[in-house]
Amino acid sequence: MLVDSAPGMTVVGEAGTGREAVERARSCRADLVVMDIRMPDLDGIEATRRIAADDDLAGVRVLVLTTYDTDEHVVEALRAGASGFLVKDTRPADLLDGIRTVAAGDALLSPGPTARLIARALRAPAVPAADGALPAALDRLSGRERQVLALVARGLNNAEIAAALSLSPLTAKTHVSRIMGKLAARDRAQLVILAYESGLITPGANGAP
């Protein structure tokens, strides 16, 4: 009822299990899936992973809902491909804003409560790639691109990155797009995760949340 009442939004399908969520994402061609972490017959993390790994669903974004912002599975959902998360007691207006911003690609990474939640979730130690793939991937970035990535991880949008580095907004946007391409990231949420997991930035350092 909430989503259908919002201008420009339509519920195209509903699912009671994780497996159904993946099937509905494929059959309904949704732009965005609001995913519960805790569901029967395939939890939300695995469902998110399958959606993110499906080439036919490359444009579908996943917004995860969790009961508590300390849910230990939040970071797993982000690593699986979720573009952001909200706690279930989020106000209706904020939920709609979250849907709009995740659909736009960078919504829940703006400075504020959600950025702090993401940073807190990412304090969980990452499992480093056996072959050092993450740090090696960062070697593909120029010095300027590393600066931009660090600012993305802090939750800055393109305009704020441009102001911080004395760039034009278009140049900042171009840098972000190139970084996504070089790191094979789906969206800005994935860039944040890569920045933390690679050690480029750590919670509480260099102004991070």
Located regions from the model:
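Short hydrophobic/Thr-rich beta-strand motif most characteristic of the beta2 strand and flanking loop
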Residues: 8-16, 24, 185
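Acidic catalytic/metal-coordinating carboxylates
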Residues: 17-20, 43-49
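Active-site residues of response regulator receiver
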Residues: 36, 66
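Receiver (REC) domain active-site loop signature in two-component systems and cognate sites
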Residues: 39-40
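Short, flexible helix-to-coil linker/hinge segments that flank and couple to helix-turn-helix
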Residues: 74-79, 84, 89-143, 147, ...
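Recognition helix of helix-turn-helix DNA-binding domains
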Residues: 155-190
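Basic, Lys/Arg-enriched C-terminal extension of HTH/homeodomain DNA-binding domains
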Residues: 180-209
